[in-house]
């Protein structure tokens, strides 16, 4: 009886060890990594940059109607055409507030993190459905926790892609893609067949090389 009890305890301990080891092995594959190979941290500044070098720079806000004098009207998220511009840093706020690292396919909010902001709208990303243009733009002015502000990060080859994934909705996740408009502006829009493949670079310096300027549609180097 004593040997049987000892064997049971031994099996239980070994099972626990193997389970912990399996969980440890599985964790790295579930965590989003930055370009240095480190886990992307929640609520820490990162630049979202194209995965392919030489295909433009980082992400910044820009108003949709370039002919308007209201620089804060319909602020969409666009990609800088210059590969030397990192854009504005972004923070990721997961639905699960207890996690320290951003997980693959986990619901999260994105928000520009800039001390310089001239517009009254929030910096939280959201989806703006334009009935007139028949397009869905990735814009700012969202609200954390709201249905049109939920996104996910999913793998795309050796890089990642952003997905719009509303919670409590029959709508499946939709790719965030790039579309070049008639003015050559690279806007983030939703797409069923294309994706914007990106990587994440930790923002070590709070002074981005993309500065706010009111005389250039709010941001330089569109």
Swiss-Prot record:
Domain of life (superkingdom): Eukaryota
The keyword Glycoprotein appears for this protein: yes
Alphabetical list of CDD domains matching this protein: beta-trefoil_STI_CrataBL-like (cd23374)
Inducing factors: Induced by infestation with spider mites.
Positions of disulphide bridges: 72-119, 165-173
Keyword Amino-acid biosynthesis (UniProt): no
Glycan attachment sites: 65, 175
GO molecular function, one term: serine-type endopeptidase inhibitor activity
Position of the signal peptide: 1-23
SUPFAM superfamilies: STI-like
Keywords: Disulfide bond, Glycoprotein, Protease inhibitor, Serine protease inhibitor, Signal
PANTHER family: KUNITZ TRYPSIN INHIBITOR 1-RELATED (PTHR33107:SF13), KUNITZ TRYPSIN INHIBITOR 2 (PTHR33107)
Record function comment: Exhibits Kunitz trypsin protease inhibitor activity.
Family: Belongs to the protease inhibitor I3 (leguminous Kunitz-type inhibitor) family.
Name by which UniProt lists this protein: Kunitz trypsin inhibitor 3
Originating organism: Arabidopsis thaliana (Mouse-ear cress)
Organism placement in taxonomy: Eukaryota, Viridiplantae, Streptophyta, Embryophyta, Tracheophyta
Gene name for this UniProt entry: KTI3
